[in-house]
């Protein structure tokens, strides 16, 4: 089932689209289950869910965009748990509006340790 939400309940501009299963939980096996929009109509955020749990086996389960369309953030989840993207354990990457990496978050599930690397807009590590 697809539900659309508009500002002030009127069709002034689309603010969110939800895809729900028969139990009313966010669910879409073929794309994002929740999409939010800027007033301009451009996509602000896409969230992937299966049976109410943030989940995407083929990429990030959370994608945020700047209004200019550039990626703001990728975050990886499987079954509502943070899931490392690769053997380096990257779970979240955030970008500046110009497209350069701002922040990388790594998580080791075995040791429960996190590592955060922050960059300035020139690409130099600051933390």
Locations of regions flagged by a protein language model:
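Glycine/tyrosine- and acidic-biased, solvent-exposed loop/turn segments at the edges of beta-strands
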Residues: 1-127
């Amino acid at each position: 089932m697809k539900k659309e939400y508009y500002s002030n309940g009127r069709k002034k501009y689309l603010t969110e689209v939800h895809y729900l299963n028969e139990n009313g939980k966010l669910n879409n096996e073929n794309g994002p289950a929740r999409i939010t929009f800027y007033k301009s109509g451009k996509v602000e955020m896409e969230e992937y869910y299966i049976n109410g749990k943030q989940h995407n086996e083929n990429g990030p389960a959370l994608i945020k965009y700047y209004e200019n369309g550039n990626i703001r953030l990728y975050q990886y989840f499987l079954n509502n748990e943070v899931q490392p993207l690769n053997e380096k354990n990257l779970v979240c990457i955030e970008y500046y509006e110009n497209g350069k990496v701002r922040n990388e978050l790594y998580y080791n599930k075995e040791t429960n340790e996190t590592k955060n690397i922050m960059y300035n807009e020139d690409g130099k590590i600051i933390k």
